[in-house]
């Protein structure tokens, strides 16, 4: 006997940032929405990614503050870490946010089903596992938002003790004395920075010629200098071939081609994420999936199958960022509503990396702009001359602006804004607006920044690009 079906306007498979954002946005537009999630609403970002990772980075920031208290005339004992307390605080933050999200979904009348959703026929999703296994929902519009999981490398099989990914790391009950972070991208640098601040001897092992390969070269240089000063070792252009567990079982030797093995207590694998698309869609439906497992979608997030959209980490060729998933979710819902949405401009999305010092950027790097044919003008301003940075005792970093040279030879359209330094992840908003509104340097330079503030460095950089500087020449 076929299962009884329930009808909705939209059915979403996946309850992470892309899925729940689509659910909330669709429900606020008056659509009836069902969302199927196999674990907890909030997905990787809330439970095993953005939120818990930043909680531990905040623990590291508190450590740094206490360690430098004497500089401000405040007497404090040398800091010690009770990691169990840090874990408990992380979990309380996650639980509180999960409860809030669950409440918002309920208030918007979103039907949340627990289990693994599978698109079994056009417009029909069946729950195949979990509490609601066997239930069937139908809708004219289906959104695939099943997310991703950490990738691993051959020879680095995850055991949850000596070899971990972000999933296992964020649930550890203790920190190692030494660690190799395999992968020097955003997540790898965040883990390396946090571990180093908390007293762990860290080595970043990166396969590419540089860490943070997606960042502007001046940003990479600044972070590399900072990490070296903090004794974070970096091995680049590395080929990892495996590891050999020590006889005691408490350490392992990471094998790197052409180099001596690196003995550490833990290997943290941070080499990107793979999409969760296996078994999500019946092949006969016609959703195109590329050879890496990603779903192919157009600018409106439509897949090759009529009535099926995809958002978030599963989408081919897009940044795997929660805020990008939010934006894609809104595009998909607007398209379902027939509102002619503006596609996400992936070259201009904001990026935030929460290592110390922080990194934030939007738009083109200098190298990208030149490669695309622009005649560029750039300007850099260090935080060392910023009064607010001096006050808080955090002066590492700089702001760099990349602009197109106008017909008069002066800096014209703002192409990219790149920041390294204190709280730059909170400062990027003005730079992001400048890039996305295709603002001219003269226009942005006319905006007044409060004094004393960290954001003055962004303002001063823009003023200097006009050809007349204040504190910056």
Question: Residues of each region from the PLM?
Answer:
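Glycine-rich flavin
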Residues: 2-8, 24-31, 36-175, 203, ...
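A conserved FAD-binding loop/helix module that cradles the flavin
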Residues: 218, 222, 311-368, 451-473
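Flexible, glycine-rich terminal cap/loop adjacent to redox cofactors
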Residues: 11-18, 22, 27-39, 44, ...
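Beta1/beta-strand and adjacent pyrophosphate-binding region of the FAD-binding site
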Residues: 4-16, 175-185
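Rossmann-like NAD(P)H-binding beta-loop-alpha module
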Residues: 173-215
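Short hydrophobic core segments
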Residues: 11-13, 117, 136-147, 182, ...
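FAD-site-proximal beta/loop scaffold in flavoenzymes
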Residues: 159-176, 261-338, 430
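A Rossmann-like FAD-binding core segment of flavoenzymes
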Residues: 111-114, 118-129, 198-299, 364, ...
């Amino acid at each position: 006997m076929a299962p009884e079906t329930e009808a909705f306007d939209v059915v979403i498979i996946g309850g992470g940032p892309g899925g729940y954002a689509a659910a909330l946005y669709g429900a606020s537009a008056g659509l009836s929405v069902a969302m199927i999630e196999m674990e907890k609403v909030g997905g990787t970002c809330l439970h095993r990614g953005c939120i818990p990772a930043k909680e531990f980075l905040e623990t590291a920031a508190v450590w740094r503050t206490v360690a430098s208290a004497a500089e401000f005339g405040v007497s404090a004992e040398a800091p010690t870490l009770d990691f169990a307390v840090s874990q408990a605080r992380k979990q309380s933050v996650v639980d509180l946010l999960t409860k809030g999200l669950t409440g918002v979904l309920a208030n918007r009348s979103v039907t949340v089903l627990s289990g693994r959703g599978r698109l079994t026929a056009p417009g029909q999703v069946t729950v195949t596992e979990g509490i609601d296994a066997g239930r069937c929902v139908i809708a004219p519009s289906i959104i695939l938002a099943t997310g991703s999981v950490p990738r691993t490398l051959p020879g680095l099989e995850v055991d949850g003790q000596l070899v971990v990914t972000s999933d296992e790391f964020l649930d550890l009950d203790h920190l190692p004395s030494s660690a190799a972070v395999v992968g020097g991208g955003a997540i790898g640098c965040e883990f390396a920075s946090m571990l180093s601040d908390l007293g762990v001897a860290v080595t970043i092992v990166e396969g590419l010629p540089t860490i943070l390969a997606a960042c502007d070269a001046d940003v990479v240089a600044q972070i590399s200098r900072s990490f070296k000063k903090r004794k974070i070792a970096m091995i680049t252009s590395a080929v990892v071939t495996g590891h050999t567990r020590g006889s005691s079982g408490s350490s392992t030797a990471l094998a790197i081609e052409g180099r001596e093995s690196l003995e550490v207590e833990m290997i943290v694998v941070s080499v990107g994420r793979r999409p969760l698309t296996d078994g999500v869609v019946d092949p006969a439906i016609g959703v195109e999936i590329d050879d890496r497992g990603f779903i192919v979608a157009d600018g409106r997030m439509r897949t090759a199958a009529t009535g099926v959209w995809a958002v978030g980490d599963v989408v081919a060729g897009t940044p795997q960022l929660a805020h990008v998933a939010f934006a894609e979710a809104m595009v998909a819902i607007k398209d379902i509503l027939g509102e002619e949405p503006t596609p996400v401009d992936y070259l201009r999305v904001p990026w935030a990396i929460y290592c110390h010092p922080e990194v934030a950027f939007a738009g083109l790097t200098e190298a990208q702009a030149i490669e695309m044919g622009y005649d560029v003008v750039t300007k850099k301003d260090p935080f060392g001359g910023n009064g607010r940075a001096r006050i808080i005792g955090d002066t590492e970093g700089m702001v760099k602006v990349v602009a197109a040279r106008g017909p008069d030879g002066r800096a014209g359209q703002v192409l990219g804004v790149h920041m390294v330094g204190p709280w730059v992840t909170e400062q990027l908003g003005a730079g992001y607006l400048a890039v996305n509104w295709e603002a001219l340097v003269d226009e942005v330079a006319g905006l007044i920044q409060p004094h004393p503030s960290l954001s003055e460095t962004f303002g001063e950089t823009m003023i200097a690009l006009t050809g007349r500087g204040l504190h910056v020449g």
